[in-house]
Swiss-Prot record:
HAMAP family: RecR. The gene is recR. It comes from Desulforudis audaxviator (strain MP104C). This is Recombination protein RecR. InterPro entries: DNA_Rcmb_RecR, Hlx-hairpin-Hlx_DNA-bd_motif, Rcmb_RecR, Rcmb_RecR_Znf, TOPRIM_dom, TOPRIM_RecR. May play a role in DNA repair. It seems to be involved in an RecBC-independent recombinational process of DNA repair. It may act with RecF and RecO. One of its GO terms (biological process) is DNA recombination.
Length: 198
C-alpha cells in the first residue's frame, strides 16, 4: 500500500522497535497521526525525557532515575544476595514476582561466541568486584533458559565459586528457550524459591 512519505517513515521507525511488526506499526502510526497533537507531543516528550534523564546504576547497571538506583540504596533489601540478569527488563520481571528482596546485577547480554560476545563485552568484571568486597553470600544466576544463558550461567559459576560464594541457578519451570521477561510472576517466584546450585 502506498502511504505519504511522512506516514511511511513513521511506520518504518515504529516497526524497528522490538515486538512491533509491520501491521502493529501501521496501527500505531495511524493512531498517532489522527490523535490530538497534544497526545503525540506528550509521547514525544516522554521518550526524550527517558533518554535524557535515565542513567545506568554504577552498582548494578540497572536503568534508574538516580545513581545508585533505589534498589541498591534500599537498606530493607538483603545486600548479601545478588540476582544476576541479562537485561534491565529482567529486573522488572523478577520484581513483579514479589518473591525476591535482594539486589541485582545486570550483565547487559549473555555469552555468545558466534556473535562475538565474550566475557569482556559483558558487565562481569563489576560482578566479580562486588563479590570480592565480601558482603555477598549468594549469587542467583537468572539468565535466560537459552543456550547462551546456560553458557553464561556455567561461566559465572566457575568464575565465582573460588570466591567462597554460593552460586545458584533459577529452578526450571521456566520454559527452555524463552526470555525471563515473558514468565508470569507465579512461575518466576517458584523458580526463585526452588533455585539450585550451579
Amino acid at each position: 500500500m502506498q502511504y505519504s512519505r511522512s506516514v511511511g517513515r513513521l511506520i518504518e521507525e515504529l516497526a524497528r522497535l522490538p515486538g512491533i511488526g509491520p501491521k502493529t506499526a501501521q496501527r500505531l502510526a495511524f493512531h498517532l497521526v489522527t490523535a490530538p497533537r497534544e497526545a503525540a507531543e506528550s509521547l514525544s516528550r516522554a521518550i526524550l525525557e527517558a533518554r535524557d534523564k535515565l542513567v545506568f546504576c554504577r552498582v548494578c547497571a540497572n536503568i534508574a532515575d538516580e545513581n545508585p538506583c533505589g534498589i541498591c540504596r534500599d537498606q530493607n533489601r538483603d545486600h548479601g544476595l545478588i540476582c544476576v540478569v541479562e537485561r534491565p527488563r529482567d529486573v522488572l520481571a523478577v520484581e513483579k514476582a514479589h518473591g525476591y528482596r535482594g539486589l541485582y546485577h545486570v550483565l547487559n547480554g549473555s555469552l555468545s561466541p558466534l556473535q562475538g560476545v565474550g566475557p569482556e563485552e559483558l558487565n562481569i568484571a563489576a560482578l566479580v568486584t562486588r563479590v570480592r568486597e565480601g558482603t555477598v553470600r549468594e549469587v542467583i544466576v537468572a539468565t535466560n533458559a537459552t543456550v547462551e544463558g546456560e553458557a553464561t550461567a556455567l561461566y559465572l559459576a566457575r568464575l565465582l565459586r573460588p570466591l567462597n560464594v554460593r552460586v545458584t541457578r533459577l529452578a526450571f519451570g521456566l520454559p527452555v528457550g524463552s526470555d525471563l521477561e515473558y514468565a508470569d510472576g507465579r512461575t518466576l517466584a517458584r523458580a526463585i524459591e526452588g533455585r539450585r546450585e550451579v
